[in-house]
C-alpha cells in the first residue's frame, strides 16, 4: 500500500524543520537573490515571500507569492547550484534555514527522508513540465525550436 501523500509531506517537513535554524525577515528583505550560490534551504513557517526572475534591468519574467508551508531552494542546495530566482519577504516572515552541509549530512544518515526529498524533487519536475505544457497550449506555436538550433 502506498504512503499517504499528506503524511509523507508532513514527515519531510517535520524532519527538516527539526534541523533548521529560524531566521526572521522584515518586509522587503531579500532571502536570496538570483545568481547567488545556494547555501541551504528555506522552510517558510510564517509570512509571505515574493519569488521572481529578474531580467537584468528590464521587466520581471515571472512573479508569484508563496506562504507558510513552502520549501525554497531545495534543488539548488542539493546540486550545489546558484539560485534561479530571487526571493523577498512581503511581510514579516519566519523561515527555518537548513545549511547545505547540515542537509546533506542528515540525508546521508536518514535514508527515508532522502527518498522523500527525491520524491519532492521529482514532483517539482513534473509540475514544471505540466506548466510548460499549459504555456505551450496557451500560445500558438508560431516560433518552434528546432534541434539544429533554428526556429521555424
Enumerate the predicted regions with their spans.
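Cyclic nucleotide-binding regulatory domains
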Residues: 4, 29-91
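Cyclic-nucleotide recognition modules
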Residues: 12, 18, 64-119, 126
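Short proline/glycine- and basic residue-enriched helix-capping loop/turn segments at helix->loop/beta transitions
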Residues: 6-27, 82
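Positions in alpha-helical segments
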Residues: 26, 61, 101, 127-130
Amino acid at each position: 500500500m502506498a504512503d499517504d501523500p499528506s503524511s509523507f509531506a508532513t514527515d519531510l517537513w517535520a524532519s527538516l524543520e527539526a534541523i533548521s535554524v529560524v531566521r526572521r525577515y522584515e518586509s522587503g528583505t531579500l532571502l536570496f537573490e538570483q545568481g547567488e550560490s545556494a547555501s541551504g534551504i528555506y522552510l517558510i513557517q510564517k509570512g509571505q515571500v515574493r519569488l521572481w526572475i529578474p531580467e537584468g534591468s528590464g521587466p520581471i519574467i515571472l512573479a508569484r507569492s508563496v506562504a507558510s508551508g513552502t520549501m525554497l531552494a531545495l534543488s539548488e542546495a542539493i546540486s550545489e547550484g546558484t539560485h534561479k530566482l530571487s526571493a523577498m519577504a512581503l511581510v514579516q516572515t519566519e523561515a527555518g534555514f537548513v545549511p547545505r552541509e547540515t542537509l546533506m549530512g542528515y540525508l546521508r544518515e536518514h535514508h527515508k527522508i532522502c527518498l522523500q526529498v527525491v520524491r519532492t524533487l521529482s514532483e517539482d519536475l513534473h509540475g514544471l513540465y505540466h506548466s510548460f505544457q499549459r504555456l505551450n497550449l496557451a500560445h500558438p506555436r508560431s516560433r518552434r525550436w528546432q534541434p539544429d538550433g533554428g526556429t521555424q
